[in-house]
Amino acid sequence: MQLAIAGGVATAIAVIIIVALVIRRKMGGRSVPPGLQPGQPLPAFTALDESGRELQSSDLRGRPTVILFVRGSWCPFCSKQVADLTKHYQDINKLGARLILITPKPLQTTRRVAKLFAVEFEFWLDESLAIARQLGLVLPNGVPADYRNEYGRDTYWPASIVVDGDGIIRHTWLSKFIVDRPDPAKLFEAVRSL
């Protein structure tokens, strides 16, 4: 009897997994926006750093750069991605590359997060989501209801871009279903391949 129940549960789990994979494949997730395709120049945009100083995307020329567009510290998947990247930060830095996180979080929150991770990530702020709109990375109603008073309704669709020293996009990863992020080792390999 117990064997039959265990077999039935295993079959049910297998069916659920197969159905989920089929649905995921059919949905296909989101595709990379036209302005972020590899081989194109990184579009011009303006952001603020954690000190409130205005920065331009053209400031990135001269060194390879990994840019992460993150939803916010309230997102467990973004927090895990940033925590995982701390393990590869030194390797990426040794290759002469920069690592920049662009976030819509308020400046005070960005400063707290910058101190929390205790690495030299650069945090760029896009609180109005102007960059997200320009690049096609807005996730409408992507902020959970519990956080909307502080962060608003919309946020970034998670993405990672590797740009070479000439400002050309070489690799773009767009999270397909909010929960997936590129393995930090893949970002490191992308920088190393430049």
Q: Which sequence ranges carry the predicted segments?
A:
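Structural micro-motif
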Residues: 118-122, 139-143, 153-161
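Hydrophobic beta-strand anchors of alpha/beta hydrolase catalytic cores
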Residues: 66-67, 99, 160
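Short loop/turn microsegments at loop-to-beta-strand junctions
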Residues: 42-43, 64, 157-159
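Short hydrophobic alpha-helix segments
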Residues: 58, 135, 171-173
